[in-house]
A protein has these predicted regions:
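Internal nucleotide-binding/catalytic subdomain
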Residues: 1-116
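Short beta-strand-to-loop capping motifs
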Residues: 12, 23-25, 151-153, 211-213
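Short beta-strand/turn micro-motifs at beta-sheet edges
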Residues: 44-46, 136-138, 191-198
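Short, well-ordered beta-strand elements within core beta-sheets of diverse protein domains
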Residues: 56-60, 149-150, 205-213
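Active-site "cap" helix and flanking loop/linker of ATP-utilizing ligase/carboxylase catalytic domains
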Residues: 69-88, 105-182
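Short, glycine-/Ser/Thr-/acidic-enriched flexible segments
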Residues: 95-99, 106-109, 152-156, 192, ...
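Generic long, charged, amphipathic alpha-helical segments
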Residues: 165-208
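Short, well-ordered alpha-helical segments
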Residues: 209-225
């Protein structure tokens, strides 16, 4: 194993809730509101199945809160010094004893950005241009919660050398119960041939389906219907 993993880090396990807080940064300050999100990493609902990079996320927009003040906000001087512009979040384990930061993500998250677009009511090009220009503005967002669910096929779990599985799902058609209503559908490895949606590529990641609601149950129901 020393050849495959020459260096590894042993970390102390902390039991708690995994939660991330993120915000867009214009080079000088954070753009409000902030984003609080909870990733779902196992392949099936109910924490069933193997771990994936991410199968979906629940999120909401908020004014700066304790989690933000104790973690991400402390990075402001370093972000200003580096001239950073973009999205940044920090993932943490939170329990009754405190907040334990895990890692930073200094880029758009996937499928985080698709789910955020469900909750942001401003045109995407408008707020991205303002952000890149270093403007100070407030994001217009929906109240309540947004949920995103990633739709995959089994090629997500195989190596590129597994030709049998890859061929099994190559170019398969993708059908919708309501083909005239595609709100909340964010495509990934999908192509259109002769008017039909089909599986493209070998990543196994087809699309992200998003929904929103004043409660988590409402947002989840919109995604699945």
């Amino acid at each position: 194993w020393t050849k495959k993993v020459p260096v590894f880090q042993l970390q102390k396990f902390v039991s708690g809730v995994e939660v991330a807080v993120g915000a867009f940064f214009n080079g000088k300050d954070f753009i409000l509101p902030i984003n609080v999100n909870f990733e779902h990493k196992r392949v099936f609902p109910g924490d069933i199945g193997p771990f994936t990079g991410e199968m979906g996320t629940l999120m909401f927009w908020s004014e700066p809160n304790r989690l933000f003040h104790m973690t991400l906000e402390k990075m402001k001087p370093a972000l200003v010094e580096s001239g950073y512009i973009g999205y940044i979040d920090i993932n943490c384990i939170v329990n009754g004893k405190g907040i334990y930061p895990l890692e930073f993500t200094a880029r758009f998250g996937y499928p985080t950005i698709q789910i955020q677009s469900e909750g942001i009511t401003m045109p995407m090009g408008e707020w991205l241009y303002k952000l890149a220009s270093g403007e100070n503005f407030e994001l217009k967002t929906k109240k309540g919660f947004q949920v995103g669910v990633r739709i995959n096929v089994p090629t997500l779990f195989v190596k590129s050398t597994d030709k049998e599985t890859i061929e099994m799902y190559r170019d398969l058609p993708i059908l919708f119960k309501k083909p005239d209503s595609l709100d909340g559908i964010h495509i990934e490895d999908v192509k259109i041939e002769d008017g039909s949606w089909r599986v493209a590529g070998v990543s196994g990641c087809l699309m992200v389906v998003t929904g929103s609601g004043t409660t988590v149950s409402e947002a989840r129901q919109q995604v699945y219907t």
